């Protein structure tokens, strides 16, 4: 008898039973997970008979007007490139859209998409005259079949790649100009606009039957659908829903894209799917598809899209890295300025449709940090790409970017490409017009906070609201609500996820505690002028990032170590404009940047101290910050530059024997050279 058989007969059966059991359980789990995913993943885009209602509706352009520091930003921008680009930059001054010989594709529509709302939000007579001149010309030259603008744009821009051989008309610029016209109609009530938009969409509808979407318009179809919905909400023409569904079914499948992001690492070459602006524009698509189909799973997908980009390409400033294509988690990778403004517009759309506070929180983070940091304080120069860890703004022969050149982060008129020169203008104006929205049951919602005034009709009654605040540089907001006669309606106040202990003092003196991550409703009768006081405490939070580095957040603001720059003129290689500012600026740091922070990561409020000053002038002008944060840190000599940028932060925690120093952190938006993602000391 073999007491120690090598292959005893009873045991294989036992192991096989165990193996079968494991396989069965595993298969059941996998099948269950697959069925769960399929049940929660949005399906085909079958349109409803009418659009599903959004949670909020944006107010018409001009209903919300900027005040305080926000008005200062719009005035600075209108005195800068926004108000003058058409006077000297050939691609707008001599645009094919007004009969010129220059580019007749996306650049003039991009500029108008920001200039038109800027004109009416600043009540600038000169800009309003420019807006009218452009709109008059475009409408006068609409073709008999409805096409707006040049029928053949610039083939070097519009028809690259595998365009159909008969692709004479590129609908992508049409998508932009339709957004321009809808804003113009809201501001002026011009009766020509709605018929012109309807004719344009009929023309696009016919073209999509003959030439399906391709290239840029294949990825950016969501911007057409935004205008289709705008028109449908006013005309209720059923064919518009069919056009929206046609675009969704012909265009890129953003549903699958954002369900499981196909590009999880830095792009090593340019590609359509990873293009940052395409992704920023695509973020609005899930919300748009919810309205088209009524499928609530699209609402969930809208935030999942943000989570996917955060997971693989998220940056401390609230953006995705994209220079030009998705570039991973390294905070020295850049993000294109077009991504900033287009992501803001997508967040505004997703916020309106879903009513999800998180979209507003992210919108403020991008707007109050990344947007102002990408431009000089006078808005005459901008960067093509911006870095969270930006230790230089100068030409680099072999840059860290994979898909743009070594001049991409200088501050100039047209660094790298001119698309951002044309498209940067929409950020502040569209944010302003989306600060307040109306609720379907006849109320008003404060969805994003900034100093402003609101004048609108609520259930037939004129309502005036004055929002007095220095937010995001202050925790206090005062709302003076005025009605001409007694009127009963609800107001909704957003309570950000990041706040703790928020309160709202009502006109009768009652103080209500607020729950983070929700809209707080105050439904009552309003009479005369009544005041509410909102307090949003801003505790410090640490965002963990690449290599366990951290960035410091307080409310919507991100704080950076601002580096003292040495500026010098930098003439572009090929383009030397003859406009008011004919040179670009480059900068090198004059102060050390390679610090690791001494932080209590369990309670950062123990390690960080706030200093506040009166807000005067431009809060995003370096040296004029109304708030700073003090923290201690040590130099980290092993952390040096690489490829013209800060090397990736060393894996935290780190050790340093250098002297412990006090460091002053400034709001990200007031810095032009900076470190934002820091290693943490042991």
Where does each model-flagged region fall?
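N-terminal Sec-pathway targeting helices
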Residues: 9-24
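Low-complexity, Ser/Thr/Pro/Gly-enriched N-terminal "stalk/linker" regions
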Residues: 35-107, 125-154, 191
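Carbohydrate-binding/catalytic loop surfaces
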Residues: 86-102, 149-169, 218-231, 260-281, ...
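Extended ligand-binding groove/face enriched in aromatic
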Residues: 97-101, 119-258
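Well-ordered alpha-helical segments within folded domains of soluble proteins
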Residues: 104-120, 169-185, 217-233, 274-291, ...
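Active-site neighborhood of glycoside hydrolase catalytic domains
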Residues: 221, 225-260, 270-327, 339-356
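C-terminal beta-rich recognition modules with glycine/proline-rich loops and embedded aromatic residues
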Residues: 302, 361-369, 374-477, 515, ...
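Solvent-exposed beta-strand/loop surfaces of large extracellular or lumenal domains
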Residues: 499-525, 542-547
